[in-house]
Amino acid sequence: MKERTYICCDLKSFYASVECIERGLNPLDTNLVVADLSRTEKTICLAVTPSLKSYGISGRARLFEVIQRVKEVNAQRQRNTPGRQFTGASSHDPEVRRNPSLALDYIVAPPRMAHYIDWSTRVYSVYLKHVAPEDIYPYSIDEVFIDATSYLQTYHLSAREFARKIILDILQTTGITAAAGIGTNLYLAKVAMDIGAKHVPADEYGVRIAELDEMGYRRSFWTHRPLTDFWRVGKGYAAKLEANGLYTMGDIARCSIGQPTDYHNEELLYKLFGVNAELLIDHAWGWEPCTIADIKAYKPENKSIVSGQILQYPYPFEKARLVIQEMADALALELVDKRLATNQLVLTVGYDIENLKGTAYTGEVTTDRYGRKIPKHAHGTVNLDGYTSSGEELLKAATSLYDRIVDKTLLARRLTLCANHLLDESSVPEDLPEQIDLFTDYSAKEKQKKEADTAHARERKLQETMLDIKKRFGKNAILKGLNLEDGATARERNNQIGGHKA
């Protein structure tokens, strides 16, 4: 089989770069964060420019962390300033570094998600100038994989030259700088970009490109820490591995070839991670058999639609119940729009840390990703009588499930509602034949069925009318009464994409 060459391209601090460019500023030397100031200081920063990151600020910091770190930097600068007084402040980083009498400042830009999607489309059009769509896999709004194998000979370029050609075209067309990782498989390309490119000096255009093959990966990254730097290794995975004495990808690779009598062997990994251990072992060795063609050809056995949100503040039982009803109603409209039906709902409600402050809560406690103690989330499933996209039925089922699984005394913060086992409406099975008995009034039953069918048809017509109005005049052009109640979130979320301002 011919060895393939993959390129993983990532737009540097994409949202922040867009905001800088539109202000006529250089994204590489302007201190800017993209965050919603209308929320609390706990709001997450969606992007941070490279110059601001250089002060020790994470790319996904909370706004209060940015504020705190900038205060620390300025306190240190002020101690070294003549007269210990600043003469001004600047968000232009070279100016700040040249002039010790200036305070470090930064711009807070509100997110504009729809605008970033437009910019992402512009960047994608640049990729299409060089590569056919079947050889591109958009991994996220600011990241793509490219199968460059067949293009290197066509363009008479090396993989590095081809990647640089694309990146410079993006820079010239949009003003956005990108980084790239090149690998002999998708995993190695991703690792080269995520980890390798960070340690490569930037060229005169700020471009960083790193390359990896299997042996290079083992030489350079088998001892790399932390494990969470690697693709698909989250904090939970890393904690399990480290609890069992596995701290690096090299440790995992050695564990996978351990003898049955050894503590560290392949069986341990399967015991810890089940079938996912196979992927972890492959990645430890730098293997990845999946291709872009495989990804595009993949058809999941089960389909689902998930709706989730983090509430702006802790909600009591009744208010969170209202939001769940909104979510169920919106989920039904999405099913109608996509001509799908579901027969199962899954609900998860995450509780807030406030529940453990000065209360007599004695239930099960767990730890969140920040190491804070919180009550264990509520989780439940309800199977419907049949496949449906009826808002009335889904709202009733979701409300009943919520009432059954949620602790009425606790404050909710995270809500997730999932419609499972989706089928195209044309594929929904007919009602199964029924065993006749002597004690059922079938005429009354038939009458009930006709009335239900009429009600469903009437509701369906109403749903389709609402969808038509929303598409033509905006999602908030028509609302239900529950969307206007205190605590409802649908109106605000209709103006958002991914939970942030559109």
How should these model regions be labeled?
Residues C8, D229, Y237-A412, S427, ...:
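DNA-contacting surface of Y-family translesion DNA polymerases
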Residues K12-F14, S38-K42, Y351-L356, L422-S426:
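Short, charged/polar surface micro-motifs in flexible loops or helix N-caps
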Residues V18, G371-A502:
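Acidic, metal-coordinating catalytic segment for phosphate/diphosphate chemistry
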Residues K42-A47, V207-A210, G358-T359, H377, ...:
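Short, well-ordered strand-loop elements centered on a beta-strand within folded domains, enriched
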Residues T177-A179, V346, T416:
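Residues at or immediately flanking beta-strands
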